[in-house]
Amino acid sequence: MVAKKTVRSYRSSFSHSVIVAILSAGIAFEAHSLHSSELDLGVFNKQFEEHSAHVEEAQTSVLKGSDPVNPSQKESEKVLYTQVPLTQGSSGESLDLADANFLEHFQHLFEETTVFGIDQKLVWSDLDTRNFSQPTQEPDTSNAVSEKISSDTKENRKDLETEDPSKKSGLKEVSSDLPKSPETAVAAISEDLEISENISARDPLQGLAFFYKNTSSQSISEKDSSFQGIIFSGSGANSGLGFENLKAPKSGAAVYSDRDIVFENLVKGLSFISCESLEDGSAAGVNIVVTHCGDVTLTDCATGLDLEALRLVKDFSRGGAVFTARNHEVQNNLAGGILSVVGNKGAIVVEKNSAEKSNGGAFACGSFVYSNNENTALWKENQALSGGAISSASDIDIQGNCSAIEFSGNQSLIALGEHIGLTDFVGGGALAAQGTLTLRNNAVVQCVKNTSKTHGGAILAGTVDLNETISEVAFKQNTAALTGGALSANDKVIIANNFGEILFEQNEVRNHGGAIYCGCRSNPKLEQKDSGENINIIGNSGAITFLKNKASVLEVMTQAEDYAGGGALWGHNVLLDSNSGNIQFIGNIGGSTFWIGEYVGGGAILSTDRVTISNNSGDVVFKGNKGQCLAQKYVAPQETAPVESDASSTNKDEKSLNACSHGDHYPPKTVEEEVPPSLLEEHPVVSSTDIRGGGAILAQHIFITDNTGNLRFSGNLGGGEESSTVGDLAIVGGGALLSTNEVNVCSNQNVVFSDNVTSNGCDSGGAILAKKVDISANHSVEFVSNGSGKFGGAVCALNESVNITDNGSAVSFSKNRTRLGGAGVAAPQGSVTICGNQGNIAFKENFVFGSENQRSGGGAIIANSSVNIQDNAGDILFVSNSTGSYGGAIFVGSLVASEGSNPRTLTITGNSGDILFAKNSTQTAASLSEKDSFGGGAIYTQNLKIVKNAGNVSFYGNRAPSGAGVQIADGGTVCLEAFGGDILFEGNINFDGSFNAIHLCGNDSKIVELSAVQDKNIIFQDAITYEENTIRGLPDKDVSPLSAPSLIFNSKPQDDSAQHHEGTIRFSRGVSKIPQIAAIQEGTLALSQNAELWLAGLKQETGSSIVLSAGSILRIFDSQVDSSAPLPTENKEETLVSAGVQINMSSPTPNKDKAVDTPVLADIISITVDLSSFVPEQDGTLPLPPEIIIPKGTKLHSNAIDLKIIDPTNVGYENHALLSSHKDIPLISLKTAEGMTGTPTADASLSNIKIDVSLPSITPATYGHTGVWSESKMEDGRLVVGWQPTGYKLNPEKQGALVLNNLWSHYTDLRALKQEIFAHHTIAQRMELDFSTNVWGSGLGVVEDCQNIGEFDGFKHHLTGYALGLDTQLVEDFLIGGCFSQFFGKTESQSYKAKNDVKSYMGAAYAGILAGPWLIKGAFVYGNINNDLTTDYGTLGISTGSWIGKGFIAGTSIDYRYIVNPRRFISAIVSTVVPFVEAEYVRIDLPEISEQGKEVRTFQKTRFENVAIPFGFALEHAYSRGSRAEVNSVQLAYVFDVYRKGPVSLITLKDAAYSWKSYGVDIPCKAWKARLSNNTEWNSYLSTYLAFNYEWREDLIAYDFNGGIRIIF
C-alpha cells in the first residue's frame, strides 16, 4: 500500500514555489513580514540556500538504519526530506477498534519531515476513536500520552525498523479487554515490550490518517526557519486528497503535526468532510499551507474543545473545526500559528463547520493568509464562539484573489454572561482577528447574513484594512448584538484605494454601529490616545454605499446606555477623504423610540469626537437616514441596578454633558408650554441632559470641507417623535447633522440639504443642530423643505452663532418649517452672520407654525443678539416667509418675555445687489393684553441699521397685525441710508387694512436717521406709526428742543471725507406720526400728493429743501411735550420752565406778572411746491394745496419763507384743469391746531408771514399752457397766485404723425400682395399651362423702416400673413384669378412711446394676356385694416384709439419678352430679357378718430393717394428637365411717383382746447426696386415659388418676401 523510501533531493515535492507562495502571502521568517506589494525573495533565498547548498547532487541510494535528520545539525549539512508515494486511501468502516493494530494500515506516523507524493484521488474515511479518551481540560496535557508513548519506546524504534518483516507480522495481538482510555491503554501496553514498539508507532487519539511527531530535543525557536512537518504534494492531473468522517479525541483528528502541514498541487482537490476533534481541528499543526490545489471542500467538521470551561474564550488560536495552526512551544506568533491558503486554482467551500465552545468555526490560527487564489471561495453556515468561520490570534490577510469570496450564514455564538461582559473582545460572525484583518486587491468579497451575539456581525478585529479591491465588496444582512452589525474593530477601520463598489446593506446591531463600529469598548465616552481618525474611508474611486443598516434597535432596555446609534458607522473620529467615487448613506437607522441614554443617534454616523468629510470629488449623499428618537418608556425598574443618589445622579449628568460637548451647554430658554398630565404619565422624562438626533451624523465636531463633488443630505430624520417629552437641558434634533460643538460646511462645490426633519416639539435644527454652525466658501448652498419642532427648520446653533460667509454662488433657504422660530436659520442664544457671499441669497416660503397661545418668530431667521447681513455681492431675497408672532422674515430677540433686555440689532450693510422683503407675514393677531407686541411682517428687531448698500432695498406686500414692514421693540432705534439704490416701503398692510412701513413699540423707541445720497430716495408709500406718542429724546432743560433733534433727515458729514446726503426722503401715502423732533440737514424732505407727516418739531438747515405736493400736510404737534425742556421764544431772555409737568402748548397759562413769549417748534426757511402734483381728480376737482400746520400758540421761527414752485417732470404746464383758464391758484396753506386731535384752522397770526414766491419759468423746453403769473397774496391763511393763460405749446409726442404714417404702411402692405401676383401668378410660365386651373397658398412678410425726416416722426412697420388664391385660363393665353389674405403686424414711432397694432383683410382680382412676346397683366387689391393705437405720455397717462381704414391699389404692367439666341454664350446665364413698364394707383382713407384716456385727441378724416410709374427690366434663366421646369429671375426697376396727395388731418387736444394740422412723414418720390424670384414646376400637378423684393428711398427701406405652393388641375 505504501512504498517508503528516503531520498535526498534538490527539489522535493515541497517545491520552491510553495515557499514563494507562503512568503508572498505574508508568512514571517525571522520576523520579516512580506506582503504581495512588498515581495522580496532575498530573505527566503538566503535561508533556503544555506540549508540546501549541497543538495544539488542527486542521491539515489536508500539510507537504511540511519538516524532521522537532526534539525540541530550545521547549516552546511544536507537536509534530508523523506518522500513517500501514496497509492491508496483507507476506510475505517471494517476496522476493529479493539485490535491493538487497527491503525496499522490506516495511520501514517512519522518522526521526520516527509513529502507524501499523490498522483490520484485518495480518501481516508470513517474512523471514530473519540471513545478512547475524554478530552483533557488543559491544552498541553492532552499531548502527554503521545509524548509518553514516544519517549518510552524511542530506543526500540530503530530495532523495529530493521527487524525482519516476518517478525512484525508475528507480534502478539492486543487482548480484547484492553482498556479504552489512553492512560490505562499506555500502562497495559508498557507491560509488554513486544507490542509497545508497534503501539508507539500508532496513535488513536489524533492524526488518524497522518501523524507527525517531532522527536528532536530542540523545540521550535523564533530563529529557526527550516521546514519541518508533513507535505502532501500532488503530481498529475488526478491527484487529490480527502478526509471524511474521521473523529478523534485530540487535536488534528485527521492530520496532526506538531510542526507544519502543507497541501500542494492537489489537482482533484482537498476535502475534509464530517471530521471531528474533541480538541483543536481536523488538521492541526504549527503552520498549515494549502496551495496550488484544485477544489477545496471543508464541510460539516466539528471541534468539541470547551474554552469556556478553560477560561480561554479570548484565545483566538484555539478551536477550528477544520484547521488549527498554533505553536504550543513559542509564544511569539511570528514563529508559528500561520494558516495559509494561497495560489489555489479550484473553488473553496467551507460549510457547516462547528466550534460551539471554541473559536474559529472552520479555522483557528495564530494568523491567517488567503492569497492569490483563482476561483471562488465560500465560507457558509460555520459557527464558533468567536470567528464563526475563521479566528486568528493575530492577523487575517485576504488579498490578491481573482474570484468571488463569500462569507454567509456564519455565526459567533458567544454571548454576554458571567465571564463575558460588554467590553470583552469577542464575537465576529465570520472572521475574528485580534490583530489586523486585511482585505486587499480582491475581486469580489461578500459577507452575507453572518451573526454575532456580541461584537462584529461579520468581522471582529483590532484593525480592519479594506483596500485596492477591483470589484464589489458587500456586507449584507449581517447582525450583531453589541457593536458593529458588519464590522467591529478596536483600533482602526481603513477603507482605502478601492476601485470596485463597497456595499454595506441591511446590517443590524442592537447597540452601536449598524454597519461598522470602531472604538474602545471599555468606555466609549473616553477619547482614544491616538487623536487620529479611527474610521478612514479615503482615496476610493469605486462607489461606497451604506444602505438600510440599523443600530440601537432594542425595544426594552434593562439599563441606560450612552453613545448608542450610528446606523452605518460608529467611531471616535471618522474621516471620508479624497474619494472620487460616490459615497452614499441611504436608509440607515441609528436608534429607536425605546432607547435610554444621553448621547444617542446618528442615523448614518455617530462619532464620539469628530467627523470629517473632505476633498471628495465624487458625490457624497446622505438620504433617508433616521437618527435616535426619544424614549417612551422607563428603564425596566425590576431589572435595573440600584439608582444613584440624587446628588451623584446630577453630578453624572453634568459630567456626561461636558464630556460630549467639550464645554458648557446653554440650551435656550423656551416658551413655557403646558404638557398634558396624561402625556407625562405615559411618557415620562428620562433625562434632562439628553443629546439625541442627527438623522445623518451625530458627533461633537463635524467638518465638511473642500469637496468638489455634490453633497446632498436628503430625507433624513433626527430627534424625537411627536409624543415624546424631554427635560429642559435636552439637546435633541438635527434632522441631518447634530454636533455638540461646531459644524463647519466649508469650501465645497454644491451642498444641498433637503427634506430633513426632526419633528418633536422640543427638537431643533431640521437639517443642522450644533453649538455653532459655519457655512462658508462653498460654491452653492441650498436648504429646501427641512423641518423641526422647535427652532431652526433648516439650521440651528443653540448656544453661539450661525455664520454663512464667502460662498461663491447662490445660497438658498426655501420651504423650510418649524414651530417656534427661524424656519431657515436659528440662533436662539447667539447671532447670525451672512457676509461676503458672491451669489444671490434667497429665503423663500419658509414657515414657522406658531399658535395663538405660544410666541414664535423669524419666518426665515431668528437670533437672540444680532443678525448681520453684510458685504454680499448678489441679490438678497426674503420672499413669502411666514411666522406666528414676530418677524415674518427676520426676528432678532427673545421669545421669553422675562429674558433680559440686551440690545438686539439687525444690520444690513455693504451689500452690492438688491435686497427685497416681499410677501412675508405673521399669522397670529395680537391678543388684547399684548395689543401691539405681535408684528413685523418682514422684520422684528430692537435696532435696525440699513446703510451703505449699493442696490435697492425694498419692502413689498408684507403683512402683520402691526408693523407690516418693520416692527421695532421698545428702546430700539432705526437708521436707514439709501446709498447706492433706493429704500422703498410699499404695499405693506396691517391686518386692519392700514398701510404700515415701520411700527415702533413702547415709549422710548425712535428713528435716529433717514438719509439718502444724491439721486437716491427713501420712499415711504406706507405710513410710519408709533405705539406711544410720547416725544422721544427731549434734551435737558437748558437746551432748546430744535437744537437737539432726535431724528435726522439727510445727515451732514462730520468732515469733508464723509458722505454727503443730498437725496430725497419721501413720504408718499398715509399719515406718518413721528413723536420726535427732527432736523433736515441737507437734501430733500418730500411729501407726495395727499401724504401727511406729523412731527414733534422740525428744524430746516440751510441747503436743504422741503418739497410739498398738492394735498400733502406737514404738521407739527405738541402732544406730551415735556416742559422741562425749554422751547425757543422770540424773547431769548425769557424761558418757560415747568419741571416735570407736561403742558399743552395750545393752552399756555399766562403769567400775569410778565408776558409769555410765543414758543417755536418749527424752524422752516423754505418750501418747494410741486406744480405737477396739482392733478385733478376723476371728476375734474382740483386738489387742495399743501398745508403746514403748527401747534396753536406757537409760531414759525422766521417771519419769512421762500416758496419755490417747481415743475420737476416738465409736465406741470400740461395741467389743463389748472392752467387752461384764468384763475387764482392756492399754492400753500398755513394753519394751526390744538394738540393731535384738534381741527386745523386758519390763524390770523400766520397771515403776517412774508413769503417770497419763485415761479417756474417757461423755457423752449417747456410744453403745455403758456401764460402770466400775477403777484402772490395771503387769503385766509392760504398763499394765492393768479394765472392768466396766453396760449399752448404742443409737445411733439402729441403731433399724431404715427396715425398718418400708418397710411403709407398700409400702402406697402397692399403693394406686397400685388407684387406676389405679378411675380408668380401672371407670368409666361404660368400662361403656358393651357386651360389649367391653379389653387395656391403662400406666406408673406413685410418690413419697413423710415427714419425721422426733419421734424417729422419716422416709423417702423412689421407685418406677416398668408394668402390663398385660385386662377384659371378661360381661353388660351388668357388668365383670370382672385385671392384672399390676412395680415397681422404693428407700426411704431421712431421717437415716442406710441404703437399701432394692425390686423388687415385683403382681397384681390387679377388677369393676364399673353400675345406672342408681349405679356399684359393687371391686378386690383382691396384692404380693410383694423387699427389699435396706444400712446404713453408717461406721468400724464395713456391714451388709446381704434379705427378701421380702407384702401385699394390698382396696377397694370406690360412686358416684352426677348429670347436670347441659344447659340450665344450668354444664353447659359440669361435665356430671356424682359423689359417692362407699370402704372400703379393707390388710395387709402382715414376715418375720423376719437381717443380715450388721458390727453385724448380727435383726428379729422383724410386720404392718401399716390400714382407711381415703375419701369425696368428682368433677366430670366429657364431650365427644364423631364417634367420639371424652373425659371429664376432678377428684376431691377426705377420708381417715380408722378402724383401724390399726402394725408393732412386737423387734430384737436380736447382738454387743452387746442387744435393743429398734422402731416405724415414726407416720403421721397423716387425709389429703386429689386426683386429675386424663383418659379419651379416639379411636375404637371405641383409647383412652388419664392421671391424677395427690396425697395430703397432716401430715409426709407422696405422689403418683403413671399413663398408658396401651387396645385395644378
Swiss-Prot record:
Keywords: Cell outer membrane, Cell wall, Membrane, Secreted, Signal, Transmembrane, Transmembrane beta strand. InterPro entries: Autotransporte_beta, Autotransporte_beta_dom_sf, Polymorphic_membr_middle, POMP_repeat. Its main location: secreted. Residues 132-183, 640-677 are annotated as: Disordered. It is found in: Secreted, Cell wall; Cell outer membrane. Residues 1-30 form the signal peptide. Residues 149-175, 651-672 have a biased composition (Basic and acidic residues). It comes from the Bacteria. It is a peripheral membrane protein. GO terms for cellular component: cell outer membrane; extracellular region. Residues 1328-1609 form the Autotransporter domain. SUPFAM superfamilies: Autotransporter. Residues 132-145 have a biased composition (Polar residues). Belongs to the PMP outer membrane protein family. This is Probable outer membrane protein pmp21. It comes from Chlamydia pneumoniae.
